[in-house]
């Protein structure tokens, strides 16, 4: 092994590792090495390359990389292919902005070939930047052999998927009200529409509809979408609700509205008189005068009539709903049910009064060409209604309203002709297949996703757009003959034309002769919703079923996928719909859902606000490993939100990587020292490690096996949120406990044999944790491994730590008894440190006594066997271990009020005061049995928490404790203890200066100190042996200050006025 430098630049070392991986083709080699092993299939959800990767992408990528690296290290062959989403609105929207495209006419004027070529030119706009980020984060994935949704083989498989659904009668053409994006001039699926809500202020109007049979009577309706009033065809009441006819005293008008809805207009019932009370059924069939004249002739087709619908309630509005079937889902359904419209009336003008751009058509003469959601349009409609005497009341309402996820413009609901996949008919299968999958965290599957599936509606998969996979439907002019094409070969067979590209410009002109004498069949204009393409990814990335048929069928469904919580209604959903429709199987077996990464202020990360640091700038400062560990050691891996803090990433260096590095460096340093001192070569031998009788050796080795067993079990359950904290805690145990408590042994203070045993233990643990942490922190583990492996025989050395299989636990090294004992020792030491901190007694100053009180005899026996460590760590002279709780401890109980209140209801008030009166004897018995009866109610350890309090004086003592033990620190200080504290602080300053000067323990130097303080000089003389034993040098007193030939000198203040100068001279 080679010497390790004193300091490390983590980011700099990572850059060297990247070059090394590139040189040895590490990823490619690892995949090749694992050929023939059991397959572990993984699907990578395709991102768009039109935007730069952000922390959400980095998080998901890190989770994917960690799991797939672990799968490789546990003996699997893991194909990892990157994918790109290339089609759809995100691409088209960029082109529309770039070229000023607003309407369909603009596209046709430009020409679809030119428009699509523009789209193609930006699809991979940031692919290079993506590759840089993915590579820099240490993610191993094949970005060269990627899949793209715009590639012909992928698109051909999408055609096959659609044809299969058509064969199963799961495809139909319909007329349906859908969320519609004015900004992108296309309908959206329900899951797209639910992804971007904003609180907005909209007009809320009460308007009156004059009844046809009595011009003095008007029916009142309430709406927040006055732009839909020109398309009104019905008024809907609830047949079971009560309604009233009233005389408005101030307005001198007669209105009909819900009996319980008068508050929408009136503050007092003195403002009106009730003329008649009626049921909703009494109103059904009543006709009224159209509010606008544009579609008055629709009265002859069953329009402008009161109808019944159960969705009407009396908790808002007037209890009567203005119904425009073309612009509301409930409106559409209730009008269908009541025969006001039918599904085949695609071209009825009143159902098409708003064009594709969100503007009124020429039929709506007063507002033709006006954008329906513009404020000016609302104003003009309001003026019209007031002039006609139909505006009864108007106000503004703040409510949550859907916006287009891509153009960020308000959506409208609009009836459109579309091609649908039947989802409602396979809901039960979707739920059954969802039950076969395993999600982390489980609540997302059981609650959020399952609830979404229960209410899933038929999926509109067609988009009247241009850059996408064309829907392969060729239809006769009368719509009677429909041909669905499932492959390029089939298209050639039926049309006589062979194509190599499947985009619109390549196939729109192709016609198919009718086989039923209906002339020529032409392709419909629509393309697929891009979610249909990404949902087809398991099949299309393999060009299934045209290629890789056997391969696909062996690895489907995927073992693992991972994406963000937002994909619950996106990719996770479309994957499940298509796999269920095609094969009645779930598309994946295991899924990790990550939460959202927010800015430090809890707001969404925004380029405009610049409220987050650039990811690559963070990585350039502290390295990718720190960012990886920060992200996957946070609640975000269990679908919770993370407020990103750059300090949190930096803390990973301070709290994890630097201590880990220092432990590794300390090992190498002392290994090389041992080799030099013994003139031997260190060769790690697990037998030597296992033979060690040292309790700390047994503990760290046992802990290491427990860790490996735990990681294997939890990784099998995909619980990163339990695994990573455990790994980090182990590194703390290794660095802050094992290494620190065994420094002298590792330096050889107990002889060569003991030193060799300690070095073997430390090597074994460092190498094990190095391999185990490989999937999580791939750079630093590689850095360490490249040096640590040099101690191994050549045949056991691998080119990369990531080629080494994940460790198996060593069964004979397990020792839960020792693990428990050391854990108890740690608790006691931490309680003692906390007591020192509270009373401002630094650890450098010795204290007289420390008492531990517990009735648990095994606990005391464990501490007795380890008391030398406790004495040293707490810097105390004596430890007292006693089970005499009666003399020192007052025991009380504290109730879990929330738990007991919910369970005991009214009896809790009677029981609560009795809990506080329980005696020491009762509570000690409760501790043994874990149960106690109070007024007939059995209380357990989950209901009561035991509190131990010290009953002695606390002027010169400081108690601490938990549910098991109580500790008391004696704060009395005598002169001998005070002097030892001074000596200890001087040692600390000498060691710091030695480190600062770059000295090792073997360097030939002399150490001196000079002081005029008699108190300090006496303290040093009285503790000379202790000082020499610790620093391994004789610290000599000098009558004078440091001479000119001293190469390191420092004036230090030991305590208060006790100053000293320490310096080193070369021998």
From Swiss-Prot:
One GO term describing the cellular component: cytosol
Chain positions of motif 'HIGH' region: 47-57
GO molecular function annotations of the record: aminoacyl-tRNA deacylase activity; ATP binding; isoleucine-tRNA ligase activity; tRNA binding
The enzyme's E.C. designation: 6.1.1.5
Entry's localization field: Cytoplasm
InterPro entries (alphabetical): aa-tRNA-synth_I_CS, aa-tRNA-synth_Ia, Anticodon_Ile_ABEc, Ile-tRNA-ligase, Ile-tRNA-ligase_type2, M/V/L/I-tRNA-synth_anticd-bd, Rossmann-like_a/b/a_fold, tRNAsynth_Ia_anticodon-bd
Binding of ATP, residues: 607
Keyword Aminoacyl-tRNA synthetase: yes
Top-level lineage group: Eukaryota
Similarity-based family: Belongs to the class-I aminoacyl-tRNA synthetase family.
Name the record gives this protein: Probable isoleucine--tRNA ligase, cytoplasmic
Organism classification: Eukaryota, Amoebozoa, Evosea, Eumycetozoa, Dictyostelia
Gene that this polypeptide is encoded by: ileS
